[in-house]
UniProtKB/Swiss-Prot annotation:
Family: Belongs to the ECSIT family.
A UniProt-annotated Pfam family: ECSIT_C
Cross-link (Glycyl lysine isopeptide (Lys-Gly) (interchain with G-Cter in ubiquitin)): K371
Described function: Adapter protein that plays a role in different signaling pathways including TLRs and IL-1 pathways or innate antiviral induction signaling. Plays a role in the activation of NF-kappa-B by forming a signal complex with TRAF6 and TAK1/MAP3K7 to activate TAK1/MAP3K7 leading to activation of IKKs. Once ubiquitinated, interacts with the dissociated RELA and NFKB1 proteins and translocates to the nucleus where it induces NF-kappa-B-dependent gene expression. As part of the MCIA complex, involved in the assembly of the mitochondrial complex I.
GO biological process: BMP signaling pathway; cell surface receptor protein serine/threonine kinase signaling pathway; innate immune response; mesoderm formation; regulation of oxidoreductase activity; regulation of protein complex stability; regulation of transcription by RNA polymerase II; toll-like receptor 4 signaling pathway
Complex and partners: Interacts with MAP3K1, SMAD4 and TRAF6. Interacts with SMAD1 only after BMP4-treatment. Part of the mitochondrial complex I assembly/MCIA complex that comprises at least the core subunits TMEM126B, NDUFAF1, ECSIT and ACAD9 and complement subunits such as COA1 and TMEM186. Interacts with NDUFAF1. Interacts with ACAD9. Interacts with TRIM59. Interacts with TMEM70 and TMEM242. Interacts (when ubiquitinated) with NF-kappa-B subunits RELA and NFKB1. Interacts with RIGI, IFIT1 and MAVS; these interactions promote RLR-mediated type I IFN induction.
The name this protein goes by in its record: Evolutionarily conserved signaling intermediate in Toll pathway, mitochondrial
Alphabetical keyword list: Cytoplasm, Immunity, Innate immunity, Isopeptide bond, Mitochondrion, Nucleus, Transit peptide, Ubl conjugation
Protein species of origin: Rattus norvegicus (Rat)
SMART domains per the UniProt record, alphabetical: ECSIT_Cterm
Annotated compartments: Cytoplasm; Nucleus; Mitochondrion
InterPro entries xref list: ECIST_C, ECSIT, ECSIT_N
């Protein structure tokens, strides 16, 4: 008998004796036959997942995380009702004074992050450093290699990363004090510290990446905000901003038009020259409003444009030779090329018509835009001989108006189909030619 057979026999005998002992302990007589033929290696008691000697404890129902009411009371407005930086700092300091052991500090920090925009401190670096100072020191730092491999105190580390992410969202650059607090709370090998190193690397590289920067503090006056938006869109520095109409204050009474909106426009000398060369038989279009975001504020603008002229009417301007002295704009280089060379670049370009002017108004109706067109006629006399078509996004359809009648506002027309619009434009063109 080999040692393999001896090993198998001993294993079968041990399983058989185990089944006999379980039968004796359970009180089942030996004479009771089994319902199924069982070997010595099988147990007489079948295993069931739902049968347990000790009942399982009931699983507690997961409830949403609720911030304690005492934390909410800290951020409620005081008697004067002002929500400013001083009241926010007072709420954070009072949490540390009344809660020495800093229990519930994670919920408090999450609540403070949500309340920061209400107090206007979402861009203040000192406030973020004060929130990081709420964490207990030298408690969440990993002490050995096992704690460094696994996330040590994951909920606290996620809260620290949330503070840094809100700083990144509002463009707040951390400083050396932030780094010292993160090392003191979480240590060098932690996720908040890794987030800090990434912010320190990329913030310095992307700080001045925008070639057209927008000031941090935007003007509150709608007129100044419109001037800033138009200057931000117009690449020509020689363009002139003109205020065609000032908005009236809300206290003004006894005026014919108490709701007079502001009208601000911009036009460059090149745009004036292009409008002077425009064919009077072809209409120009007032389109809009189009949105423009200046940080967290959205303004709307309108444009005065025309369709692309036909190829036979296009004039190619020759670049003077004195412009090519140091920075050539045209190069005619005849290199030896084979028949397989591709002379065309693979670029997707959409050619659009010229834009003659832009404006921002306090109201986006046709009556306000007609005043803008009338103001443009003072510096562009040829505009009085060109038909103007209003294509407003919020109007019922394309409204056709001829700016020769300065005293009358163009009547509103019902919605038209594309065929009726073409017929109306052609009729207006024939009228302009006559």
């Amino acid at each position: 008998m080999s040692w393999v057979q001896v090993n198998l026999l001993a294993r079968g005998l041990s399983r058989g004796w185990g089944s006999i002992c379980r039968t004796v302990l359970s009180g089942t007589p030996f004479a009771q036959p089994s319902l199924q033929a069982r070997g010595l290696h099988c147990s007489a008691v079948t295993h069931k997942d739902d049968v347990w000697l000790v009942p399982r404890p009931s699983e507690p129902q997961k409830k949403p995380i609720k911030v304690p009411a005492m934390h909410e009371d800290l951020f409620r407005p005081s008697g004067n009702g002002e929500q400013d930086k001083a009241s926010f700092l007072n709420a954070v300091r009072s949490f540390g004074e009344h809660n020495v052991r800093k229990r519930g500090h994670v919920d408090f920090i999450y609540l403070a992050l949500r309340k920061m925009p209400e107090f206007g401190v979402e861009r203040d670096l000192s406030v973020y450093n004060l929130l990081l100072d709420v964490f207990p020191k030298e408690v969440f730092r990993p002490r050995n290699a096992i704690q460094r491999i696994f996330v040590h105190y994951p909920r606290q580390q996620e809260c620290g990363v949330a503070v840094l992410e809100q700083m990144e969202r509002h463009g707040v650059m951390p400083n050396t004090e932030t780094e010292f607090l993160l090392i003191q709370v979480f240590g060098h090998k932690s996720y908040p510290m890794l987030k800090f190193l990434r912010m320190k690397l990329w913030f310095t590289r992307f700080k001045n990446i925008n070639p057209y920067p927008v000031p941090r503090d935007l003007p509150q006056d709608p007129l100044d905000l419109a001037k800033l938006g138009l200057r931000h869109m117009e690449p020509d520095l020689s363009a002139k901003v003109t205020v065609y109409q000032m908005s009236l204050p809300s206290e003004s009474t006894g005026i014919e038009d108490p709701t007079q909106p502001h009208i601000v426009g911009i036009q460059s000398p090149d745009q004036q020259a292009a409008l002077a060369r425009h064919n009077p038989s072809r209409p120009v279009f007032v389109e809009g409003p189009f949105p423009l975001w200046l940080r967290n504020k959205c303004v709307y603008y309108h444009i005065l444009r025309a369709d692309l002229p036909p190829p036979e009417e296009e004039t190619v301007e020759e670049i003077p030779e004195e412009w090519n002295l140091y920075y050539p704009m045209q190069l005619d280089l005849e290199y030896s090329r084979s028949a397989w060379d591709n002379y065309e670049f693979d670029m997707d370009e959409v050619t659009e018509g010229p834009v003659f002017a832009m404006c921002m108004t306090g109201a986006h109706d046709q009556a306000t835009l007609v005043k803008w067109i009338q103001g443009l006629q003072e510096t562009n006399p040829t505009l009085a001989q060109i038909p103007v078509v209003f294509r407003l996004a919020r109007s019922t359809g394309e409204l056709l108006a001829t700016t020769r009648l300065e005293g009358q506002s163009p009547p509103h027309s019902p919605p038209k189909g594309p065929e009726e619009d073409d017929e109306a434009i052609q009729a207006q063109q024939r009228q302009g030619q006559s």
